[in-house]
Amino acid sequence: MSEVRVRENETLDSALRRFKRQCAMSGIMSEVRKREHYDKPSVKRKKKAEAARRKNAKK
């Protein structure tokens, strides 16, 4: 869980910006999106294979 304490003489906007950056760096939002809906194991395998195919095509 990301936690940001508002510093002395710090605006709420800058504290919110720090919090958002911290969440992005820790990968919280991507994890939430990934767990938002259940994916069957077969669908997970298909997505993984497609990602590998895209990665190899990029090279």
UniProtKB/Swiss-Prot annotation:
<dbReference type="Pfam" id="PF01165">
    <property type="entry name" value="Ribosomal_S21"/>
</dbReference>
<dbReference type="GO" id="GO:0006412">
    <property type="term" value="P:translation"/>
</dbReference>
<comment type="similarity">
    <text>Belongs to the bacterial ribosomal protein bS21 family.</text>
</comment>
<dbReference type="GO" id="GO:0003735">
    <property type="term" value="F:structural constituent of ribosome"/>
</dbReference>
<protein>
    <recommendedName>
        <fullName>Small ribosomal subunit protein bS21</fullName>
    </recommendedName>
</protein>
<feature type="compositionally biased region" description="Basic residues">
    <location>
        <begin position="43"/>
        <end position="59"/>
    </location>
</feature>
<feature type="region of interest" description="Disordered">
    <location>
        <begin position="32"/>
        <end position="59"/>
    </location>
</feature>
<dbReference type="InterPro" id="IPR038380">
    <property type="entry name" value="Ribosomal_bS21_sf"/>
</dbReference>
<dbReference type="GO" id="GO:1990904">
    <property type="term" value="C:ribonucleoprotein complex"/>
</dbReference>
<keyword id="KW-0689">Ribosomal protein</keyword>
<dbReference type="GO" id="GO:0005840">
    <property type="term" value="C:ribosome"/>
</dbReference>
<feature type="compositionally biased region" description="Basic and acidic residues">
    <location>
        <begin position="32"/>
        <end position="42"/>
    </location>
</feature>
<dbReference type="InterPro" id="IPR001911">
    <property type="entry name" value="Ribosomal_bS21"/>
</dbReference>
<keyword id="KW-0687">Ribonucleoprotein</keyword>
